[in-house]
UniProtKB/Swiss-Prot annotation:
Chief subcellular location: nucleus
Protein name: DNA repair protein XRCC2 homolog
Subcellular location: Nucleus
Any one cellular-component term (Gene Ontology): replication fork
Record keywords: DNA damage, DNA recombination, DNA repair, DNA-binding, Nucleus
Any single GO BP term: reciprocal meiotic recombination
Organism of provenance: Arabidopsis thaliana (Mouse-ear cress)
């Protein structure tokens, strides 16, 4: 090996000046409600815990749309980050069509008013087009839609080995996207505990065969955490991971025992007194130490009080466990299939808008925060 080859081999990937310019330009950013209480920085790992059908994937989709949307486009403010989203689907139930429909509605929302204040939209403006397809043709920006969808990288994994393989190739995929001018922003995992039981069974079978080379459940998770740490060292991104719950009480005792008035309880000005998480932790300690922020979502015990008109809306409560905040956010999820007038749901915390096209097979939800 000659001197030139040796120098090229030990040459760093970037200079100290390049490294500082890359790190210092990454500022904290806020996601849309209900993930807006804590500013997130590159390197943060947010764990969103909740039972099945607790709108965890819905929250990820809304956060992904806010990430892939640009801040402005042709003079219209969209309020996005304009960054790349990496979505690892471990549940294998992600519906790309729902992402597409929600993105189109988000674009229409901004185009209708041009300033994002779409709750001021009148009923006559909503019914100016006969169908959702006509709205898409008349107001929809296909070029912007295509550029946003290109920033969404979707990977489906069926077991832990495929997850490890995908994590090892993500660095190369990110480099390809960055070469095209797209900077990575968020890595989403839905959900991190999807393979827990299969890996646990495989570990038991490996112990019976006395095969030392077989990976145990703990070793698999440790390897996954190591690969994620490598990505965080090289790329400036935030990790959002959902996790299901097991052996969780329907309405935890710590929530029912809060001695507050009904007004204070609804406004969210209450503090959680529980020091332990209200669910059974099943992930290994390596993952628990890797997580920097923790959120739990529950079905609200007083969901029957959250009604608009004749519709019983599903209500959920979102609580920050790490860092522990004294405020509990509440949001609603609607599943209306017919075209309705845009009607906001007012509370002291969140303002939820529902826009459902008549031809859509999926519900579309948007959340906007009121000044409190």
């Amino acid at each position: 090996m000659g001197d030139d080859e040796a120098r090229s081999w030990i040459r760093g990937d970037e200079t100290a000046k390049q490294m500082l310019s890359r790190v210092l330009k990454d500022r904290a950013f806020l996601l849309i409600p209900p993930l807006h209480r804590v500013p997130l920085r590159a390197g943060n790992v947010v764990e969103i815990t909740g039972a099945s059908t607790s709108a965890k994937t819905q929250i990820l989709i809304q956060a992904a749309i806010s990430c892939i949307l640009p801040k402005t486009w042709n003079g219209i403010h969209y309020g996005g980050l304009g960054k790349l989203v990496l979505f690892l689907d471990l549940d294998c139930r992600f519906d790309v069509l729902r992402l597409s429909q929600m993105l189109k509605h988000r674009l229409l929302q901004a185009n209708w008013l041009g300033n994002g204040a779409w709750w001021q939209l009148e009923e006559s403006n909503v019914k100016s087009c006969k169908s959702a397809e006509e709205k898409t043709k008349t107001v929809f920006d296909e070029e912007l839609y295509a550029s946003c969808m290109k920033r969404f990288l979707y990977v489906r994994c069926y077991d832990s080995l495929e997850l490890l393989s995908s994590l090892k190739t993500l660095h190369y995929r990110i480099q390809q996207q960055e070469a095209c001018g797209s900077q990575v922003g968020v890595l989403m995992i839905d959900s991190i505990g999807a393979f827990h039981w299969t890996d646990r069974l495989s570990s038991s079978l490996a112990l019976e065969t006395h095969n030392r080379k077989s990976l145990s459940l703990t070793n698999v998770v440790e390897t996954i955490v190591q690969e994620l740490k490598k990505l965080l060292l090289v790329h400036s991104l935030v990790v959002l991971a959902t996790k299901g719950t097991i052996y969780e009480e329907k309405y935890p005792a710590n929530e029912n025992n809060r001695k507050v008035s009904s007004n204070d309880h609804f406004s969210g000005n209450v503090a959680s007194k529980a020091q332990q998480p209200p669910f059974r932790e099943f992930m290994p300690s390596s993952w628990q130490a890797f997580v920097t922020h923790k959120i739990i979502i529950r079905k609200s015990a007083d969901y029957q009080s959250l009604q608009t008109g004749q519709q019983n809306l599903l209500a959920y409560s979102l609580e920050w466990l790490q860092p522990q905040l004294s405020r509990i956010d509440r949001f609603i999820v609607d599943d209306v299939r017919k075209l309705t007038t845009i009607k906001p749901f007012y509370s002291k915390l969140l303002l939820i808008y529902i826009v459902i096209p008549a031809s859509s097979s999926h519900a579309v939800w948007y959340c906007h925060c009121l000044v409190t």
